[in-house]
């Protein structure tokens, strides 16, 4: 009898919870419709994987890519709608958040074709790989729209857990296992530091968790200039620093880049930067509005260290992926300039524009690395010598992406950096912009060093990897080359038409 009553109570409680969740989804689901499309794609992948004995690989890729493209279409369809707060204050939808969600979806859409042949050659589990990519994308999208401390903590953890699993996906590779262990340990430590900073923010504001309510709480409690806020700022900056990977929070980056599967590195190198930048802009600009001088100083130090250390250490690297790891550390220093400038002087617009170009430049470079690695089995920079004599198309594509990363005119990277530095100069960040210009020259040096190797025709410099280079006859190469062509075009042509891109970015500058 007692068991029967308890069972009925359990059923009633479960029904209430389900009805409440259904009610929230029914009345607020339109606000997270792009995320719902991804969730439906995830469910569809799981259903196909559990019901089908034979894996239809093209069909799995089609479902993943279609769900991402449909999410992008849903975002564009609701462009310029009024900002709304939904799910009892957990999420906020506006153009500023949606532009970051668009960038994350764009990264994932371009990364999936890069992984097709790689996964087939390495015989990795396909369904799980796609599930992790889509789930990480979902976590990044929720992070961009998060409006309270709990969601801001849970969403990046969803992204991070999938990132840990993806970085260690090649379980037989010792380097991959080592990279995953370091990534997991440092990621766990940074998450604990971040949540500790949130606890100081929560207590100082009188128990508020929504971002705008935290500001109101700090005003009511007169704690907006207290030592507690300074402590919260330091801990949160360190926690976000791990996600952005500026110096000195960059130790995990080179090992993870070198040890992880190359398509995974391509995915993490852009999506993590976009998601962390979205988090940084909202956290620093809203709850720490009254501490702008303090967090400006902290970010300036991080930007200077990142630009100097990242670009100087990149010169000495012999692995292409490690070189790009240190290059990305330097690149995030440029992005931080836009975060510091903020809403004034088009700082956010310049940051968004540069990140759009960075996605195309970086993914284009990684597409070339994936293709070269599959055909030669090496990642050593020295082994790229003479590639132009065997595969001019691949060599020219890699050269264009590297030159754009370095910021040479008239490529997109040059105009992106020019606008970013100009906004920083107008905001009075003269020293920071000067460091950025000098380190950009340093980056051009090591990019040109690689391009010189690509174009060499002297037999004594060409390694056996290029001498025995053969273009793969596999049809699946087309997907990698398609992503590569799209990224190369996006790294070159948009630089000529900067004004429309900047104008679109400027339209997103409201919260």
Swiss-Prot record:
Membrane topology reported for the UniProt record: Multi-pass membrane protein
CC annotations in GO: chloroplast thylakoid membrane
Main localization category: plastid
Family named by the database record: Belongs to the complex I subunit 2 family.
HAMAP family associated with the record: NDH1_NuoN_1 (MF_00445)
PANTHER family recorded: NADH DEHYDROGENASE
Protein's name according to its UniProt entry: NAD(P)H-quinone oxidoreductase subunit 2 A, chloroplastic
Species of origin: Nandina domestica (Heavenly bamboo)
Gene label: ndhB1
């Amino acid at each position: 009898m007692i068991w029967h009553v308890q069972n009925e109570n359990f059923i009633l409680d479960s029904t209430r919870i389900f009805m409440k969740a259904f009610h929230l989804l029914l009345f607020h689901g339109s606000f997270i419709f792009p995320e719902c499309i991804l969730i439906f794609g995830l469910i569809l992948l799981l259903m196909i994987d559990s019901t089908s004995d034979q894996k239809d690989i093209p069909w799995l890729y089609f479902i993943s890519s279609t769900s991402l493209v449909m999410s992008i279409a849903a975002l564009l369809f609701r462009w310029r709608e009024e900002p709304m707060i939904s799910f009892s204050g957990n999420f906020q939808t506006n153009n500023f958040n949606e532009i970051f969600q668009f960038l994350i979806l764009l990264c994932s859409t371009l990364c999936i074709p890069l992984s097709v042949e790689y996964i087939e050659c390495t015989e990795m589990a396909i369904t799980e790989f796609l599930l992790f990519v889509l789930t990480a994308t979902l976590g990044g999208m929720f992070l961009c729209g998060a409006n309270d401390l709990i969601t801001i903590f849970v969403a990046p953890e969803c992204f991070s857990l999938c990132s840990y699993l993806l970085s260690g996906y090649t379980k037989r590779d010792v380097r991959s296992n080592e990279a995953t262990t370091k990534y997991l340990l440092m990621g766990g430590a940074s998450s604990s530091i971040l949540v500790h900073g949130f606890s100081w923010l929560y207590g100082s504001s009188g128990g508020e968790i929504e971002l705008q309510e935290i500001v109101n709480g700090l005003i009511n409690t007169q704690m907006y200039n207290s030592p507690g806020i300074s402590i919260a700022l330091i801990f949160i900056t360190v926690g976000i620093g791990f996600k952005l990977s500026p110096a000195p929070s960059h130790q995990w980056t080179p090992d993870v880049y070198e040890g992880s599967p190359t398509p995974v590195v391509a995915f993490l190198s852009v999506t993590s930067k976009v998601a962390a930048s979205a988090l940084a802009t909202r956290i620093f600009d809203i709850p720490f509005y009254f501490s702008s001088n303090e967090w400006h100083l902290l970010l300036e130090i991080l930007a200077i260290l990142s630009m100097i250390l990242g670009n100087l250490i990149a010169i000495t690297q012999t692995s292409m992926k490690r070189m790009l790891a240190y290059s990305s550390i330097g690149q995030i220093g440029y992005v931080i300039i836009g975060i510091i400038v903020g809403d004034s002087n088009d700082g956010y617009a310049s940051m968004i524009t540069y990140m759009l170009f960075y996605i195309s430049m970086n993914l284009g470079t990684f597409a070339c690395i994936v293709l070269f690695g599959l055909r030669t089995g090496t990642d050593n920079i020295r082994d790229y010598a003479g590639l132009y004599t065997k595969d001019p198309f691949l060599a020219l594509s890699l050269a264009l992406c590297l030159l754009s990363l370095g910021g040479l005119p008239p490529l997109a990277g040059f105009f992106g950096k020019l606008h970013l530095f100009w906004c920083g100069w107008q905001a009075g960040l003269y020293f920071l912009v000067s460091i950025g210009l000098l380190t950009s020259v340093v980056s051009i040096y090591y990019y040109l060093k690689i391009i010189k190797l690509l174009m060499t025709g002297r037999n004594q410099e060409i390694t056996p990897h290029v001498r025995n280079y053969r273009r793969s006859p596999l049809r699946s190469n087309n997907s990698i080359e398609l992503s590569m062509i799209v990224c190369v075009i996006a790294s070159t042509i948009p630089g000529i038409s900067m004004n429309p891109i900047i104008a679109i970015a400027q339209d997103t500058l409201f919260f």
